[in-house]
Amino acid sequence: MKRVTLLLTAGLVLLTATALPILRAGAQTAVVTDDNLSESIANAKTPADHEAIAAYYDQEAASAEAKAALHRRAASNAKPVGMANMCNGLAQYWDKVAGEDKDLAKAHRAMAKGAGSGS
């Protein structure tokens, strides 16, 4: 009886020792940055991978929206020096970038759902 208990305990310890690192690796999703974006997209397979990429694009869209707002404010201040058109053009550019980033985030969220359904 002691021997069976010892073997079961040893087996459980061995199983835990091998499963724990695997579970931790699966639970850790790397943060997507400018530096690893291409690699993250190329290696994305799980819903968590695509959600991390979508979060990156959400941040990029928010940054672009902030730049657009900055240039809209600058346009109202730049009217006296004749630079309002340039500022408005930059605001439109950043609005377009924000829209594209939102579309990319939406696409990766759709891929996350597809990866989660096994298709």
Q: What positions do the PLM features span?
A:
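Bacterial N-terminal signal peptides
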Residues: 9-19
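Positively charged n-region of N-terminal signal peptides that target proteins for export
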Residues: 1-4
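Amphipathic alpha-helical coiled-coil segments
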Residues: 91-116
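Short, charge/polar-rich alpha-helical segments
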Residues: 39-65
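Short, charged, amphipathic alpha-helical segments
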Residues: 51, 55-58, 84-99
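Short E/K-rich amphipathic alpha-helical oligomerization segments
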Residues: 35-41, 62-89
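Short N-terminal segments immediately surrounding and downstream of signal-peptide cleavage
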Residues: 24-45
